[in-house]
Amino acid sequence: MEKVPMTTAGFETLKEELRWRQQQERPRIIEAISEARAHGDLSENAEYHAAKEAQSYNEGRINELEDYIARAEVIDVSRLSGNQIKFGATVKLLNEDTEEKKVYQIVGDQEADVKIGKISISSPIARALIGKEEGDVIEVNAPGGAHNYEIIKIQYI
């Protein structure tokens, strides 16, 4: 069974979503199915079909969450240190083309959200950063072309 790296915060978020889906969403959907059944003929009952579809999605997501949680390799980023970039690092970069500064934390696939600065360990930019140090310059091939970034700061917070 392949381990899935994730931060402590990411692990807690997955556990909370699992709890919500099992304890709140599942009973709500069961109630919706029951109500829709009470309306009679199921073959043309849109409410029933929508509730069954929601149930299928919810149960699939529960199975997925249980799998990720079972395979989680939880890494407490606050206990990490070092000069090289590894999983969990928060990295400040300077785009050498635009002079724009960006801050990213390298996280597990399930917790990645680029809008809040969390990039997946398997993303092209994270793969280019792993093992590098402050002052190094990396080249990232993105859909819009290649970009050069200078690593300004590495933190484990």
Curated annotation (Swiss-Prot):
Domain of life: Bacteria
HAMAP family attached to this UniProt entry: GreA_GreB
Name of the protein this chain belongs to: Transcription elongation factor GreA
Encoding gene (name): greA
GO molecular function: DNA binding; RNA polymerase binding
Record PANTHER family: TRANSCRIPTION ELONGATION FACTOR GREA
Lineage: Bacteria, Pseudomonadati, Pseudomonadota, Alphaproteobacteria, Hyphomicrobiales
Keywords attached to this entry: DNA-binding, Transcription, Transcription regulation
Cross-referenced NCBIfam families: greA, PRK00226.1-2, PRK00226.1-4, PRK00226.1-5
Gene Ontology biological-process annotations: DNA-templated transcription elongation; regulation of DNA-templated transcription elongation
Function: Necessary for efficient RNA polymerase transcription elongation past template-encoded arresting sites. The arresting sites in DNA have the property of trapping a certain fraction of elongating RNA polymerases that pass through, resulting in locked ternary complexes. Cleavage of the nascent transcript by cleavage factors such as GreA or GreB allows the resumption of elongation from the new 3'terminus. GreA releases sequences of 2 to 3 nucleotides.
Family assignment from sequence similarity: Belongs to the GreA/GreB family.
Database matches in Gene3D superfamilies: Transcription elongation factor, GreA/GreB, C-terminal domain, Transcription elongation factor, GreA/GreB, N-terminal domain
